[in-house]
Amino acid sequence: TYLAAFDALNFSPEHLLYIVHEGSILKRSLSTFQTVFGGDVFMGEYTGEHKDLDASFLFSTNVSMCRSLELFDKKQFDYIIIDECHHAAADSYKKIIDYFEPEFLLGLTATPERMDNQDVYELFGNNVPYELRLRDALVNELIVPFKYYGIRDDRVDFSKENERKMISQFVTEDHCEFVVEHIEKHRVPNQKLKALAFCKTVSHAKMMAEALEPFYKTAYLTGKNDTGERVR
């Protein structure tokens, strides 16, 4: 975000549009731009709650902007930033990109290669002004190094066609003990454990949180949780 803010500062746009997919990211991004630009630029939000149409720098979610394109001139923004632009293959983003005619369009992402083979680079003319790969970031100590463990799990039959039946195998007493065993084996000794587990479905997340509750303080988050619940 700071990289985009400093590039925008160098470009010196009269009107800037910043698109994100989530409200909490929007507020952090706006705060970053306020830090870089100071109080000389009127910045505002265009979301379900705020409609700061007079702002020179407008920060909006893709959903809100996609629903309100007719309120804006095609050339209204001379600089547009698409944050988390690996999402830009979605229809709402494509409508925004196709509608506006900025002098400069910038996309930011840490994961440009999508699993569905949709080409994010093509949306930006295959022009990559700056790229920093994970290995280079690690070598330059820009991010915390990590250790990756591949653990063989023979307790689950992944060939089952019924997804719910397959997921139910994850929460058996035997499998939970297996998970806890490896968590304890690889965790840092004598330090508070903070862990994030990615699950296949909402029901899977709920079931795993409940199954591991006897061993750890657990909670599960889904798209239905609001920002306050996520932060807490």
Predicted regions and their residues:
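Walker A/P-loop
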Residues: 1-7, 194-198, 221
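Hydrophobic residues on the short alpha-helix immediately C-terminal to a glycine-rich phosphate/catalytic loop
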Residues: 3-11, 29, 96
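Conserved helicase ATPase core of P-loop NTP-dependent helicases/translocases
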Residues: 27, 42-53, 206-207, 216-232
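Conserved Walker B
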Residues: 80, 84-86, 205
